[in-house]
């Protein structure tokens, strides 16, 4: 079994394309995909987000469904690495009620926080109110 920190180290955008590709290849086999949801620690933060988004975007809808709120939260700022990848993946999500619940939760949160940017970004993918 390969250590998740080793995989995250490979996903760092400061690495060569080859090392990043190896990290993505290894990350595909990680069962607990929550580790790729915008990690924020001393060594692994925005420097791995784009590659984490690549890994997440390859996952099936049923694998992503438990993490829809976190994926929608990634859209708070489209300047964040990986945000456009997540946006495009969510546009193709076929989750029905699970998606609508997560979307409405995040939309209401954005409205409560008066976060017009996030609200606008959420509207790019649409959902039900």
Where do the protein language model's features map onto the residues?
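Structural detector for internal amphipathic alpha-helices that build alpha-solenoid repeat scaffolds
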Residues: 18-29, 49-62, 73-77, 81-93, ...
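N-terminal "cap/leader" segments of large eukaryotic alpha-helical scaffolds
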Residues: 1-25
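Alpha-helical scaffold segments
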Residues: 2-6, 15, 33-45, 51, ...
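Amphipathic alpha-helical scaffolding segments comprising HEAT/armadillo-like alpha-solenoid repeats
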Residues: 1-10, 30-41, 61-74, 96-108
């Amino acid at each position: 079994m390969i250590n998740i920190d080793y995989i995250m180290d490979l996903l760092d955008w400061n690495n060569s394309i080859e090392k990043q590709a190896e990290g993505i290849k290894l990350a595909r086999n990680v069962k607990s995909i929550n580790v790729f949801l915008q990690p924020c620690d001393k060594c692994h933060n925005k420097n791995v987000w784009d590659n984490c988004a690549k890994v997440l975007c390859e996952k099936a809808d049923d694998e992503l469904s438990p993490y829809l709120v976190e994926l929608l939260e990634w859209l708070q700022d489209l300047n964040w690495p990986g945000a456009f990848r997540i946006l495009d993946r969510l546009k193709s999500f076929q989750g029905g009620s699970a998606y609508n619940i997560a979307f409405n939760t995040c939309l209401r949160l954005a409205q409560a926080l008066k976060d017009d940017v996030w609200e606008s970004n959420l509207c790019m993918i649409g959902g039900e109110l």
